Each structure stands twice: as C-alpha cells, then as structure tokens.
Amino acid sequence: MASYTVKLITPDGESSIECSDDTYILDAAEEAGLDLPYSCRAGACSTCAGKITAGSVDQSDQSFLDDDQIEAGYVLTCVAYPTSDCTIETHKEEDLY
C-alpha cells in the first residue's frame, strides 16, 4: 500500500495530509481534522468538488462529472484516491457551472 502527500488549498489556507492509495481524500482530510464540504459521499453530486492542479487521482467510482470536467481537472474528493503526490484546490462546486 502506497501513501501520498495531498496538499489541499482551502479558502482558509493550505494543509498537507498523508493519504494512502486505498483511502478517499475526503476521509483522510477529515481524519486530519480538516472540515471540507460534502453531501452524498458517493460521487453522485458536486458538493465536494475540487480542482487538481498537480499530480493524479483515481476517481473511477464517481458518476457526476462529465468527461470535459474531468479533463479540466475537477475531482470529487469523496470518491478520489491519490495515485501520486497531488495538490487540490477545494470548495470548487460553484466553478463547475
């Protein structure tokens, strides 16, 4: 099992967390004491949306984002596993529309 450093850029500042490749980024952030937005926790809405600016994730469990949004770097943190060290800007739901 690999572990990666995930840098989260929130409206309140930056935080770096460790996240294993079998843990959703939202879950790891909560375990680290960060308060990120979420609703369904199933990849079926956009409340937890963020934008990845470096690195990569596996969000194959998501069912909300379309191909263009994924291509643009949007990620649903509730169903995203890190596949490398990565940087994600959180609180991006409004930018999807």
From Swiss-Prot:
Classification via PROSITE patterns: 2FE2S_FER_1, 2FE2S_FER_2
Gene that this polypeptide is encoded by: petF
The protein's role, per its UniProt record: Ferredoxins are iron-sulfur proteins that transfer electrons in a wide variety of metabolic reactions.
Domain (2Fe-2S ferredoxin-type) ranges: 4-94
SUPFAM superfamilies assigned to the protein according to its UniProt record, in alphabetical order: 2Fe-2S ferredoxin-like (SSF54292)
GO BP annotations listed: electron transport chain
Binding partners and assembly: Forms a complex with heterodimeric ferredoxin-thioredoxin reductase (FTR, ftrC) under reducing and oxidizing condition and thioredoxin. Interacts with a number of proteins including RpaA; binding to RpaA is higher when ferredoxin is reduced.
PANTHER family (UniProt xref): FERREDOXIN, FERREDOXIN-2, CHLOROPLASTIC
Family to which this protein belongs: Belongs to the 2Fe2S plant-type ferredoxin family.
Disulfide bond annotation, renumbered to this chain: C19-C86
Name of the molecule in the record: Ferredoxin-1
Keywords in alphabetical order: 2Fe-2S, Disulfide bond, Electron transport, Iron, Iron-sulfur, Metal-binding, Transport
Molecular function GO terms recorded: 2 iron, 2 sulfur cluster binding; electron transfer activity; metal ion binding
UniProt cofactor(s): [2Fe-2S] cluster
Cofactor details (free text): Binds 1 [2Fe-2S] cluster.
Bilayer-crossing regions: none
Residues annotated to bind [2Fe-2S] cluster: C40, C45, C48, C78
